[in-house]
């Protein structure tokens, strides 16, 4: 209600959608390597896309205050974006306890006319775009520790 009163109804719609979806992947966040959205704002403005930017923070398990910014396009079929954290909380050379080393591929569906915008926002070859809706699949690179062979896991 507060977002709607502040004229941010489209952001509220995104949150409402997130609340209503079933468990699993349903959206996509693109992370840049900067602390601002200068490049991304120019791309969205050039393509006639409105957006909302907000600051965010949280305390991590090491009791550090992590800060970053979020950009929410009003168009719900575009991914939202985040800047890098002010402190890098990501462990080096980390392999998840389930054996996942990294994300190998994400298939994300959207409208045909939005695909060029997303390609301009994200040049990472991990992201595969198609005409459709939301995240279709995620492929992980997984290490099997017993024989150290690499396996792909699909979800």
Language-model regions, residue ranges each:
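Glyoxalase I/VOC metalloenzyme domain signal
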Residues: 1-155
């Amino acid at each position: 209600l507060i977002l709607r009163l502040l004229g941010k109804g489209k952001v509220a719609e995104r949150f409402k959608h997130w609340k209503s979806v079933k468990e699993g992947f349903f959206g996509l966040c693109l992370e840049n390597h900067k602390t601002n959205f200068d490049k991304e704002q120019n791309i969205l403005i050039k393509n006639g896309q409105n957006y909302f930017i907000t600051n965010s923070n949280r305390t991590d398990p090491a009791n550090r205050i992590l800060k970053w910014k979020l950009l929410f396009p009003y168009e719900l079929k575009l991914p939202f974006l985040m800047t890098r954290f002010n402190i890098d909380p990501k462990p080096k050379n980390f392999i998840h306890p389930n054996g996942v080393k990294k994300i190998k591929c994400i298939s994300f569906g959207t409208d045909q006319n939005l695909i060029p915008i997303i390609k301009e926002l994200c040049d990472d070859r991990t992201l595969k775009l198609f005409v459709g809706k939301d995240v279709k699949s995620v492929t992980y690179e997984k290490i099997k520790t017993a024989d150290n062979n690499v396996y792909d896991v699909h979800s």
